Swiss-Prot record:
UniProt superkingdom: Viruses
Segment forming the signal sequence: none
Protein name: Replicase large subunit
Annotated region (Methyltransferase), positions in chain: 58-820
RdRp catalytic domain: residues covered: 1565-1678
Pfam families: RdRP_2 (PF00978), Viral_helicase1 (PF01443), Vmethyltransf (PF01660), Vmethyltransf_C (PF08456)
Miscellaneous remark of the record: The replicase large subunit is translated as a fusion protein by episodic readthrough of a termination codon. When readthrough of the terminator codon TGA occurs between the codons for 1303-Lys and 1305-Arg, this results in the addition of the RdRp region.
Bias (Polar residues): 720-733
Assembly mode: Heterodimer of a large and a small subunit.
Domain spans labelled (+)RNA virus helicase C-terminal: 1141-1303
The enzyme's E.C. designation: 2.1.1.-, 2.7.7.-, 2.7.7.48, 3.6.4.13
Organism whose genome encodes this protein: Potato mop-top virus (isolate Potato/Sweden/Sw) (PMTV)
UniProt record similarity statement: Belongs to the ssRNA positive-strand viruses RNA-directed RNA polymerase family.
Length: 1812
């Protein structure tokens, strides 16, 4: 057949025609065949439908809705019995089907957690599955749901004809759970365990404590489902809960529309007959057929489920989120545990998902309108039907230019809006455009048509020019130029950039018509850290690591070789030859000095205990020493005057000389004549050569040179034992016939005269001095000290420079500490014990691969001790430096660390400088001192001391002149520094002992650690006394008092002997004095207060196999006293825990408190003390307004949280037998009556409620037997807890119920996008009543307190004021009388205090409460290292280094600019002062108080009399010296700052706004807002010096830096009117020329060191205020702990959504951030009573008008309303008051009416610094 015919027959038209014709003829074959096919299809469909699971949704639905459900869920047979008529029936039906679909997708034998599910529905099932529902009651609707489900389930049970045993058990269990939860709720018990049940609990899934492992065999898998319940659950919280409960898969659903992603504020949800509305950060769901309440959820949380793919849980597990399908408006999702990928090495992944928008038939159409308020063109976009827009475009383009009119287009659009003309007839369409949009559509189309026609003409012209046959050179060049540079001119381009910057829209794109995207692409990625990282955080392969190790080892070997060569050239103090590395031993050796042997012995053995026992050993090798020195020593005995190279000042008495003589005579044959050799032949000393076999031995045989003198005993009854390093055989044997002192001398001779062996000699070897040789540590003198005859000296030094990263001249150079660049030369090696220098912190010790926890902990503890010494010595250097530089000049003022100085420069008996003697406040004399001279103070040495004793007085060696001074050798000059650091310094001998132990005492097996974890007072000490056998066991404890108590009890209860009692020691005493004891078991009392390494050291040294630790896991643990390091292994690894929960000390209410607050988990604490009640609280509302509210009760123990509070309490209690300790110091002690005090209202991490407060609360509450009274200035957690205990019934106290506060959920932040950015007019409404009500809402009750006569009562009444020792009062001044001053009467009643009048009482109160109450830093801080690292970081983070200007500061122009800014009065005062620079005392300041009292903006008691702010200011001539320089430096700093770092120089809100305009309001941030307390008064030397180092970057020279530092160190302030003089140490004087700048940069640099500011996106600093933004989601640790422990700042961190800075809120207004002043500060000041005349009122009005301009925008007031509600925790909206406030400050007449004034406005000019 022809192919064309076949093709026609097989075409669709022919086939359709045939089928239609044949199928309609009844009886035809084709008709019958088609009927059979259709019948078969119907039968198959019916059979398949029967196999589907039937679901009766029971809702009243129509046929269309049922058909829609069948289409959405084809795997189910959906029917309805229509027995329920409820709200949003379609949504409820879909929820039921979704529940069934997801439930059946899990295995039947698993356990399912249904989040927010209907437990009643699950309980009715008969499929054998088990479901636990988490149904928290977060609002009233949740409570309603619970009641509905209860009724539904009870009706199900009642209606059942037969209830199976299984269902009956389920019903009984549900009833039991309901009753238990209800009973607990009535008791206010809301703990997770209290709300737990079997089939359901009332906890959030994140807090659910149901344990599914209790079901069956405990191996059932857990799954999760969440049907429309995840809207408000943060995704990370959800997966973290899944990880905790081991839920591997979770499936769920939520309502979603693609319109949400494209930004539509309102959209339809047709499948559930509903709609959504986005309102700010919330999304609201409602239903058209539902009169009931809708649902409101967190939009930000919901969007995470749409946008995220990879989610990392809190514990590290990674979960994969998949959007599985979209059924109608319901999104199905699955979260699966994908952590196995990480195990397999997958560290990063990415995903892309496309969400279809289903908008193919729509286009984005631009519309324009006119804003009525601003008359500006406004723009918006609408989605219009593509068909309508195409018709409109076709019609508009076919019209001629004169036919395109608005009327014609609107007429056409109106007639064809929802109709289309086909064949001359109109047919309706489904979509219709809103008729209100037609005029705007017409406008857009007219402009669009005109632009397209103009564009068509341009294209036509260009095309014609291109198709010409002839070419021209000009045309080609023009085309190339336009192609490269564009046709637009440079001017137009610039205007374009400016327009874009100003957000000015223009061009053809304004009227562009675009298609809606088909889908929205969402990307997500995850990147996990590698498991292998080095200390710097960079990932390295094994080959790279091997290469680096080999390079490091080669470097160390070369460095060691060169060090040995240099030392060999310089060491001349041993009796043997020293062969250089790589040199033949046959070469002539270097000559040695004459006194070497004796100097070695004296330096090493000068201070020894007299009880040491030593074995005599035969001399194995000839002893070599100086014959001259030997003869002199025998004949005269004056060798003890030799200079000691270690800085140990030797103090010898007759008894020691006699012992030396006896020892010498007894051992003369063995030591001197029989086998002695002299290396200094008197006749021919120059020709002496050493033999080859006398070369130095290997380093393994070396003994360490360490001071072993009169070490301090920690325990007074501990007998001293020698610290000489002996072999075990020598130390264990004894010779009873030999005098101990003689044995000691013999052993010393053995060590001194035998061949000296050195180990690990490096360039940082110790300084050794003698009469003939001096080896200097400083690298800059190293070349000069090398032997001139050795040609290798210079080459060796050069080689050293080449090998090391630092030149030789900087290895051990003592720094010029006035410059940071010079401080970088500080020694970076381990300091010897007596070196007192700046040094960098030692590097953290490396960890070997095979190290166990014990080894790591011991190594870390050694490192901690070294760091502690480095930090302490750096502090000592700072104190010496301040002394040498003249910073200290008065003994009346305190000094750092209670430092004082004893000078032997002029007085041989010694003279205390400034008349200040050192006595430790509780322990007496110091064990160490730092000796230095003025000329060479950088070579200071730490020496051990001997003080007055009875024998010295008998011998006449003590006199009244030196009875309070240590014993120093005759002829020793210099200055001795004593302070709290040098008092004990046990770290030095302990470190020496432990380093030896770490190398030699290695136990193969780690001891087994058992912790007796007992509550306070449980009898831990009693357990030790009963269980410890002192014959073969050992007992150590942390505190001396505990050790003494244990010894007494062992003696009385166990009849222990004196020898046995020596096995009960403090840990320090054991490490210092006992090296020989061994024990199988070590009992360690309060072991948790010690570093784990210390415990392991004690155990290993004792060879103990078991350690029984007594401790309390909830009390204060080991505290790291070196702030700049982080400890990883400080906590013990416990093998076994024995719990003791019975206390014999604490009363019943304390036991109940410990139980209720779950300090010990679920354990119940019981007490044997029958006392029922012992707790009492006194808070700010109970009269605790100041420290004077605390009663002085003899015999009571006073406890404080902070050391500064302890000192304040001691001053308050005065002289007498008062017991005051910190909570930390009191741990382990017991008292009858305790007063616990919190004297500060500001937050601290150890205050109750703080991050680390729990141990301090436990210790503080459990010290007493009879009573505890808690006095607190803040109503903190402990205050409320103890107050709550007072209301507990006595019967309940015996039951120890649990209690915890109600948990609340915090919503996240989602900002609304705004298009318009125009100011909105504020309505002129409101009255005086609105202002008063606004104030009373925030501060109820504050306005009714009258304080008018408070100042009068203080000035005239009897007042007892304790004067600090640094205060002096001269009573011969004329007393100022209080005068009554009244002004205008304010109509507003606020808590604005009256102005105070200066007087004696006011001045003393201000000094005592402010300047004299400054906190003191307790931690060890290495200031040198902190300053260096902080300044280096500041250069990178704060400044553009290319703009740092360090040129000369002192210029005539700069001084002139500063001069013109001064007032005429100040200029006259400076001109009248003719003192020269040498006559000016920069440390002397004037003192006054501010009359204005800072008003309280909180609910703290108004009855407390607030101390006035103090002003400490220098003479004008001092400001003339520093003022121009500081002004220029601050100008240079401003220029060099990076754009995102803002320095607020007292700018107004309008001036600050440009600084934040670069911030995007659509981008969320993590904000840090710090509030400092007593900022000026908390300054230490660290603040002063770090700011000076910063200023040096900008040109501050050394002389001015010195004078500036001196002016802020020890200062004298004088109140010349009232006769008060005070001495102040390290405080920022509030009236000097750079107070604001110094405060700003002190705060900025401290925050830089404490926070990762390099990641900050915005930061602004001004005075003590700061505001910092970090990227959203970044985890930021609270810096307050570090600011307190390192920078001495008492502060708290604010976490507000609406941030504040310098009294101004940073708010989002339109498209920008703006600053707006705090309205409540203004409102409070409107209650002033001292405004006297119209002029001052006009000045105030003008100032308010300048500063509050932003209130003219209604949007600002709206944002402020939200901000103040959050900041002041208002219970309602205060917009009415803000409107009234704006109204009253915009009109002078209304403003004057606030003060009952009717005068006229006086035009005045107000300066920037005007304050009212």
């Amino acid at each position: 057949m022809d192919q064309s015919i076949l093709s026609k027959i097989t075409s669709d038209d022919y086939v359709n025609a045939i089928l239609h014709t044949s199928a309609t003829r009844v009886g035809s074959d084709l008709h019958n065949a088609m009927c059979n096919v259709i019948v078969d299809q119907i039968k198959d469909s019916t059979e398949k439908n029967k196999k589907k699971k039937k679901i009766d949704v029971k809702r009243n639905l129509n046929e269309d809705q049922i058909q829609l459900l069948a289409e959405l869920f084809p795997e189910r047979r959906v029917v309805t019995s229509s027995v329920h008529r409820g709200t949003h029936s379609m949504a409820a039906a879909m929820r039921k089907i979704e529940t069934d679909v997801i439930f059946t997708s899990f295995p039947k034998n698993g356990v399912i957690y249904d989040i927010g599910g209907n437990w009643a529905t699950h309980a009715k099932r008969d499929d054998g599955g088990f479901v636990h529902c988490c149904c928290p009651i977060l609002d009233f609707r949740d409570a309603q749901r619970k009641m509905t489900r209860l009724i539904d389930f009870n009706r199900f049970i009642d209606d059942a004809k037969v209830v199976s045993a299984e269902k009956a058990a389920v019903a009984a269990q549900i009833k039991k759970d309901c009753d238990l939860i209800s009973e607990n709720a009535k008791k206010d018990a809301y703990d997770a365990n209290d709300l737990n049940g079997t089939w359901f609990c009332q906890n959030k899934f994140e807090d659910c404590v149901y344990d599914h492992s209790t079901l069956g065999d405990g191996k059932k898998e857990a799954y999760g489902m969440a049907i429309h319940s995840i809207y408000d659950i943060h995704l990370v919280d959800l997966v973290s809960a899944m990880e905790r409960k081991k839920v591997r898969v979770l499936k769920g659903t939520f309502l979603f529309s693609a319109d949400i992603i494209i930004g539509k504020k309102r959209g339809e949800l047709p499948s559930v007959n509903g709609f959504y509305i986005i309102d700010g950060e919330s999304i609201k769901y409602s239903f058209y057929d539902d009169p009931n309440c809708g649902y409101e959820h967190n939009l930000n949380s919901l969007m995470l489920y749409v946008t995220k793919t990879f989610v990392k849980a809190a514990g590290g597990a990674v979960y994969y989120l998949e959007l599985t399908e979209m059924r109608g408006d319901t999104m199905f999702f699955t979260i699966t545990d994908a952590s196995e990928a990480r195990v397999m090495g997958v560290l990063h992944d990415s995903s892309t998902k496309c969400l279809p928008l289903n908008k193919r038939d729509l286009v984005v159409f631009p519309l324009f309108d006119i804003d009525r308020a601003t008359d500006e063109l406004v723009f918006r976009e609408e989605l219009l039907s593509r068909e309508f827009v195409n018709r409109a475009l076709e019609y508009a383009f076919q019209l001629k230019d004169n036919q395109v009119t608005a009327e014609g287009l609107i007429s056409y659009f109106a007639s064809t809006n929802n109709a289309v003309v086909i064949g001359g007839s109109a047919r309706k369409t489904s979509e219709k455009v809103d008729p209100k949009l037609l005029p705007m559509i017409t406008t857009t189309l007219m402009v669009y048509q005109e632009l397209q026609k103009a564009k068509q003409k341009r294209v036509l012209g260009k095309l014609k020019s291109k198709v010409k046959e002839e070419l021209t050179l000009s045309g080609i060049l023009e085309s190339v130029v336009h192609r490269v540079f564009g046709r637009q001119s440079l001017y137009q381009r610039g205007l374009g950039v400016f327009a874009k910057w100003m957000q000015y829209s223009y061009g053809q794109d304004l009227v562009g018509i675009h298609d809606v995207p088909l889908y929205l692409e969402i990307n997500d990625r995850i990147k996990l850290g590698s498991a292998l990282k080095n200390v710097n955080g960079f990932s390295l392969s094994f080959s790279e690591l091997d290469e680096k190790v080999s390079l490091y080892e080669e470097y160390e070997r070369e460095r060691q070789r060169i060090s040995d060569e240099i030392v060999s050239e310089k060491i001349g103090l041993i009796g043997e030859g020293y062969v250089k590395v790589g040199e033949s031993s046959l070469k002539p050796k270097q000559k040695v000095a004459s006194r070497d042997g004796m100097a070695q012995w004296v330096s090493g053995e000068c201070h020894l205990y007299n009880t040491m026992k030593c074995e005599e050993k035969p001399v194995e090798k000839p002893r070599r020493f100086s014959k001259v020195v030997l003869e002199e020593w025998i004949s005269e005995g004056n060798c003890f005057a030799l200079n000691n190279s270690f800085g140990d000042e030797v103090h010898w008495f007759d008894s020691l000389k006699e012992a030396c003589g006896r020892a010498w005579r007894k051992q003369v044959s063995a030591v001197t004549f029989s086998d002695a050799e002299y290396f200094d032949n008197i006749e021919n000393t120059e020709n002496e050569e050493l033999e080859e076999e006398e070369v130095i031995k290997t380093t393994e045989q070396v003994e360490q040179d360490w001071p072993i003198g009169n070490l301090p005993d920690v325990d007074p009854d501990d007998s001293a034992s020698a610290q000489v390093c002996l072999t075990e055989s020598a130390s264990t044997s004894s010779d009873e016939d030999c005098d101990p002192m003689e044995q000691l001398i013999v052993a010393a001779c053995e060590r001194a005269f035998a061949t000296k062996k050195f180990e690990e000699v490096t360039m940082d070897s110790q300084v050794v001095q003698s009469e003939e040789i001096e080896i200097v540590r400083e690298g800059e003198h190293a070349h000069a000290n090398l032997s001139s005859g050795e040609s290798e000296s210079s080459s060796q030094s050069q080689e050293l420079v080449a090998v090391g990263s630092v030149p030789l001249s900087k290895w051990a150079q003592m720094v010029e500490d006035s410059e940071v660049r010079a401080r970088q030369c500080a020694v970076d090696h381990d300091l010897s014990w007596d070196e007192v220098k700046y040094a960098k912190m030692p590097e953290r010790p490396e960890e070997a691969e095979g190290d166990d926890f014990r080894t790591k902990a011991k190594r870390e503890f050694l490192w901690y001790l070294k760091c502690k010494l480095v930090a302490d010595k750096s502090t000592l250097v700072e104190i010496m430096r301040d002394f040498i530089y003249g910073q200290f000049h008065s003994g009346a003022c305190e000094t750092p660390k209670n430092a004082c100085f004893l000078s032997y420069e002029k007085n041989v008996c010694g003279e205390w400088m400034f008349g200040k003697r050192y006595r430790h406040p509780s322990k007496g004399a110091s064990s160490y001192a730092v000796r230095f001279t003025r000329e060479d103070w950088k070579r200071a040495k730490l020496i051990k001391l001997q003080w007055k004793n009875a024998k010295a007085e008998e011998n006449g060696e003590m006199s009244s002149d030196n009875s309070d001074k240590p014993i120093v050798p005759q002829g020793e000059t210099g200055i001795y520094l004593f302070c709290d650091i040098t008092f004990l310094m046990n770290e030095i001998p302990i470190l020496n002992r432990l380093e030896i132990s770490f190398k030699k005492r290695v136990q193969r097996r780690a001891p087994r650690i058992t912790l007796v974890d007992g509550v306070p007072g449980c009898g831990k000490s009693t357990y030790v006394v009963k269980e410890a056998n002192l014959v073969n066991q050992y007992v150590v404890t942390i505190g001396r008092e505990a050790a003494e108590d244990l010894r007494e009890r062992f003696k009385s209860e166990r009849n222990a002997t004196a020898t046995q009692l020596k096995r009960v020691r403090t840990v320090d005493s054991y490490l210092l004095n006992d090296t020989q004891s061994r024990a199988n078991v070590l009992h360690f009392d309060e072991a948790l207060m010690a570093h784990a390494g210390m415990v392991y050291f004690c155990a290993d040294d004792l060879s103990a196999r078991s350690v029984i630790c007594q401790g309390d896991s909830q009390q204060i643990p080991f505290i790291n006293r070196v702030e700049s390091i982080t400890l990883r292994y400080s906590k013990l690894e416990i093998d076994n825990v024995v719990e003791k929960r019975l206390t014999y000390r604490s009363p019943l209410d304390v036991a109940s408190y410990l139980t209720k607050k779950n300090f010990y988990g679920t354990s119940v604490v019981t007490s044997a003390n029958p006392l029922v009640r012992s707790l009492k609280t006194v808070g700010p509302r109970d009269g605790m307004t100041s420290i004077y509210s605390i009663p002085k009760i003899p015999g009571t123990q006073y406890l404080t949280f902070l050391q500064s509070e302890k000192e304040e309490m001691r001053q308050y209690l005065g002289r007498g037998n008062w017991n005051v300790n910190t909570v930390h110091e009191s741990q382990g002690k017991t008292y009858d009556n305790v007063v616990l005090c919190r004297l500060k209202a500001t937050d601290n991490e150890i205050y109750p409620g703080g991050r680390n407060s729990s141990p301090y609360m436990v210790v503080g509450v459990t010290r007493h037997r009879r009573s505890l009274v808690y006095y607190t200035k803040a109503e903190d957690k402990l205050y409320f807890d103890l107050a709550e205990m007072l209301s507990v019934q006595e019967g309940k106290l015996m039951k120890h119920l649990h209690e915890e506060g109600v948990k609340x959920r915090q919503a996240s932040k989602y900002e609304e996008i705004m298009v318009s950015d125009n100011a909105v007019t504020v309505p002129d409404v409101g009255n005086l009543v609105d202002l008063q009500e606004m104030y009373d809402i925030a501060f109820p009750g504050n306005s009714i307190v009258d304080t008018y006569f408070d100042g009068y009562e203080v000035a005239t009444g009897g007042l007892q004021i304790d004067m600090n020792a640094s205060l002096t009062y001269y009573p011969n001044r004329q007393m100022k009388m209080w005068k009554e001053c009244r002004g205008m009467y304010p109509m507003l009643r606020t808590a604005m205090p009256e102005k105070r009048q200066s007087g004696l009482a006011e001045g003393l109160l201000a000094l005592n409460k402010r300047n004299m109450a400054a906190p003191k830093l307790q931690e060890s801080v290495n200031e040198f290292e902190v300053i260096e690292s902080t300044i280096e970081k500041a250069k990178k983070v704060f400044f553009d280094e290319s703009r740092i200007d360090n040129s000369k500061l002192e210029t005539f122009e700069g001084a002139a600019r500063w001069w013109v800014k001064q007032s005429c009065t100040a200029q006259k005062q400076m001109l009248a002062d003719v003192r020269t620079l040498s006559e000016i005392d920069v440390t002397s300041y004037n003192f006054m108080i501010k009359g204005d009292v800072k008003p309280k903006l909180d609910l703290s008691p108004q009855s407390e009399y607030s101390a006035l702010q103090t002003v400490v200011y220098p003479d004008k001539i001092v400001n003339a010296l520093f003022g121009p320089i500081m002004k220029e430096i601050n100008e240079r700093i401003r220029v060099a700052l990076k754009p995102h770092v803002i320095y607020n120089t007292r700018m107004t809100s309008d001036e600050l706004d440009p600084a934040v305009e670069f911030l995007d309001v659509r981008e969320d941030h993590e904000s840090v807002e710090i509030d400092f307390s007593k900022f000026d008064k908390s300054k230490t030397s660290l603040h002063i010096r770090v700011v000076i180092e910063l200023y040096k970057l900008f040109g501050l020279d050394e002389m001015i830096a010195y004078l500036w530092e001196k002016s802020q160190c020890q200062t004298t302030i004088k109140d010349r009117v009232n006769g008060i003089i005070a001495q102040i140490l390290y405080q920022q004087e509030s009236g000097n020329c750079d107070t604001y700048g110094s405060n700003t940069w002190s705060a900025a640099l401290s925050l830089l060191e404490s926070l990762p500011l390099e990641k900050a996106t915005f930061m602004i600093f001004g005075g003590d205020d700061s505001l910092i933004f970090f990227p959203k989601g970044m985890v930021i640790e609270d810096p307050c702990r570090r600011l307190a422990s390192m920078w001495n700042f008492d502060c708290k961190l604010f976490n507000f959504k609406n941030n504040s800075f310098c009294g101004k809120f940073l708010i989002k207004v339109g498209e920008k951030y703006k600053f707006a002043p705090d309205p409540y500060k203004l409102l409070t000041k409107l209650g002033r009573k001292d405004i006297k005349n119209s002029d001052l009122l006009s000045e105030i009005f003008t100032s308010i008008g300048d500063n509050y301009k932003s209130y003219d925008d209604y949007r600002v007031l709206e944002a402020l309303n939200v901000a103040v509600m959050e900041r002041y925790k208002l219970r309602c909206d205060v917009m009415f008051g803000l409107l009234a406030l704006k109204k009253y400050i915009n009109s002078f007449d209304l403003f004057a009416s606030l003060f009952s004034h009717k005068g006229r406005y006086q035009r005045v000019e107000v300066g920037r610094n005007f304050e009212w």
